[in-house]
Amino acid sequence: MRIRRLALVLTLAGTVTASCTGSTPAVSPRPSSSSTAVTGGLSVVPARSDPLCKAVPVHRPRNVGPAGSLPSVFARVAQQVEQIRSLTYMRPVRAQAVTRAAMNQLMHDKAGSQEPRQSAARTSKAWATIGVIPRGTDLYKAVSDFDASQVLGFYDPETRRLVFIGTNSPGPFQRFTLSHELTHALDDQHFDLTHLDRLQSCRDDEQGAYISLAEGDAVVTSVLWARQDLSAQELTQVEQAAGSGPPPPASVPPFLVKLMEFPYEAGPAFIETLLQQGGPGAIDDAFRHPPVSTEQVLHPERYPSDRPVTVEVPNAASKLGRRWKEIEIEQVGEEWLQLLFGLHLSSVNAAANSDHWGGGQYRAWSDGAHTAVVMDTAWDSHQASARFAQGMRQWLGNRSTATVLQVGPALVRVLFASDRQTITLLRRIMG
């Protein structure tokens, strides 16, 4: 769980209150308690059993080392966070102030193995084919560059380590950052934030919803803390410090910036609604029964009853050819689609085209030189699906390497390819 500078600018500027074809897919009604699969033609390999969708193992060490005692200034912030959240720490928190250079090194070390690089390369190929990032984007480097310029602190639920940029005698802005991370630590002790790591891969939208819950709580709590503890002059200092940092580097595509900032923008509004409905206890209940889609975060009135259907794009690797391999599966939610539309359309049209989403997924394949992507999305009604299909056609413009298909009353399939030869093949197989 990380706090980013752009998030602080957005927070402080606002107000916080108390994916030859087979048969046409069949769309099941929106369930109220469990997900229903929506599948297309060809032989279906469920995403949840796909090798690309392995759950990330969580190894929380039994002994994470002595916590020690917090410096008095840190302890005071922790006590105030307890008061705002109506919770108490069950064990001491290890908090460490570090330099920017040390923070970047810690994050580099945590990235670790080659798997994140390989996964990012596959995602980059799929996203470039869809058209949300430029071709040739090094997504791993883009994320690293973004974090190196924007991350101000983090709390690691696996090691229970809290780190922020600052000193042991923190000023107002550093204490503001500390209050955010201390909220994560408090939530972790009561609700176990490693839940995020245990979510199976390929459940990207559900992960985004959970991150929005956690970051939303931390943002709201830190703002309430600032308003209670800081003087008017200190609040001005915090706002100035938040706005004085560097913008994201040019290596970071706009789509990625928006994707990474989403939890800090939509999450607080979701938390505000919970507070208005039931106070801090409603936030606690949300951690026990988290939102399962970014739709629920964007539309709190749809939480918790409006659950998504499970859309599974057929695995077309064998139909594409002997050299083709599956490279990526991603759950596509309202947030992702709204950000896609926002690259070329107005924010109003982006929101309208992605509203009343019911479920979605894309799958991507490559033979090394060519890439194919199929995105299936389910909608609450034919009207919503038709609006999405029309919006996608507008978004694609005169692109010759993509096709939008209305394949059911409330199901839309979009085909993307890296080149004309591949889109012709994909249309024959999946069109």
For each feature predicted by the language model, list its residue ranges.
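Catalytic zinc-binding patch centered on the HExxH motif and its immediate surroundings
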Residues: 104-121, 136-162
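C-terminal soluble interaction/assembly domains
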Residues: 358-431
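Short pre-active-site segment immediately N-terminal to the catalytic Zn-binding motif
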Residues: 162-179, 206-209
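C-terminal motif of bacterial Sec signal peptides marking the signal peptidase cleavage site
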Residues: 16-19
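Pan-zinc metallopeptidase signature
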Residues: 79, 251-370, 376
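Active-site recognition of the HExxH zinc-binding catalytic motif
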Residues: 81, 176-193, 218-219, 271
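Post-HExxH zinc-binding segment in Zn-dependent metallohydrolases
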Residues: 188-194, 198-238
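Bacterial signal peptide processing site
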Residues: 21-23
